[in-house]
Amino acid sequence: MAKKYFGTDGVRGEVGQFPITPDFVLKLGYAAGQVLVQHDTDQKPTVLIGKDTRISGYMLEAALVAGFTAAGVNVVQTGPLPTPGVAYLTRALRLSAGVMISASHNAYSDNGIKFFAEGGVKLSDEVELEIEAKIDGEMKTLPSARLGRARRISGADDRYIEFCKSTFPSHSDLRGLKLVIDTANGAGYGVAPKVFHELGAQVVSIGDEPNGYNINEKCGATYTKTLQAAVLQHEADYGIALDGDGDRLMMVDKNGKVYDGDSLIYVIAKARAREGINIGGVVGTVMTNMAMEIALKEQGVDFCRAKVGDRYVLAQLNQRSWLIGGEASGHILCMDKHNTGDGIISALQVLAALQTLNQDLATVCADWQPYPQTMINVRIQKGQKWQEASKDVLAEVEKELEGKGRVVLRASGTEPVVRVMVEARQADWARDGAERIASAIGSL
């Protein structure tokens, strides 16, 4: 059954526009609370609510609290905390569920609601459908004796900081390193600098003055120019950029070069292989560069591709019992450290890997150079049979690029566009292949 409200990462949209309105979020909290009560009949469920730094977080948090407590669920509120921190505390405190109020890397004018089940794992499709089935039902407030309570928890930041530090090798530290930390004026502003400082690094913090409106604004993992300039200005060893909710990571070296998720995953995987740790393999996506796949296999590390989206990477990791995966966008999963993507923990794993390899980031990543890519968006008409139109040309290009490149065709889920991506060892091969396929699709 198709979901009506939940997308690939919870419920998200522009604040004030359905479904990110106080009345809908009230109903969402109430419906989720009803499902929790049904699943946890032995005791009154407790849910943890965290948020990022958007001005709308206050409004949406109040609506969620009202909905949960009206359904008979207790609520624990953390205030601003990264999404992976909410997942961790949900597990550590043995709570029934966790909720994060955030729109991740989007502008402050958007917001969203993301749920975690018991144990800090993402909700299953089945539970999301259960919640959706109740959203449009009538709200009936329970008798006062059965209502839930709400309270703010103290020390949530400190618990999460200690957890992050525990994922770094106990025999090592970060003394001697100068790091610039860009927290995107987001959820990690109060915790990320402390993690690296307490492990011994000299820390310069930027993007750490949220005002409700400046989250992700010319800062963070989706805008690295500010971090690159700061690394050069402060003559730092590395720069670390998170996104608004702290689950993405980009890094910058001392020369101002940016390293995306693919490069950082390679560093972690190579170090684990060098240490003889069996990670099973690495899960990337259909957009992961082919050169990285080849480089991993040269290190003896298996590789497979999932659909784009960290939930699909996570599903493949769980299915295969592998430990490392992620996307070029900076979602990195280290399953032996945390059960969700975590920008802070991923950065710590990269820094630990560089110590293991006794090399800097540029040297390790020189093992492979990304194959050139050509991407073309082709507009199509509703109902257009673009697969049939491109079938013969696609087969020709794939045969020509066998072992030397690959083709990815993706229909956009939000606009009438087919995205043609061709990558190959040589840029002209990629460009020629993409143009031929795009021409075939657009010829109808």
UniProtKB/Swiss-Prot annotation:
Belongs to the phosphohexose mutase family. It comes from Neisseria meningitidis serogroup C / serotype 2a (strain ATCC 700532 / DSM 15464 / FAM18). InterPro entries: A-D-PHexomutase_a/b/a-I, A-D-PHexomutase_a/b/a-I/II/III, A-D-PHexomutase_a/b/a-II, A-D-PHexomutase_a/b/a-III, A-D-PHexomutase_C, A-D-PHexomutase_C_sf, Alpha-D-phosphohexomutase_SF, GlmM_bact. Gene3D superfamilies: Alpha-D-Glucose-1,6-Bisphosphate, subunit A, domain 3, Alpha-D-phosphohexomutase, C-terminal domain. Keywords: Isomerase, Magnesium, Metal-binding, Phosphoprotein. The active site is at S104 (phosphoserine intermediate). NCBIfam families: glmM, PRK10887.1. Transmembrane segments: none annotated. Activated by phosphorylation. Its cofactor is Mg(2+). It catalyses: alpha-D-glucosamine 1-phosphate = D-glucosamine 6-phosphate. Binds 1 Mg(2+) ion per subunit. Its EC number is 5.4.2.10. One of its GO terms (cellular component) is cytosol. Mg(2+) binds at S104, D243, D245, D247. It comes from the Bacteria. The keyword Phosphoprotein applies. Catalyzes the conversion of glucosamine-6-phosphate to glucosamine-1-phosphate. One of its GO terms (biological process) is carbohydrate metabolic process. One of its GO terms (molecular function) is phosphomannomutase activity. The modification Phosphoserine is found at S104. This is Phosphoglucosamine mutase.
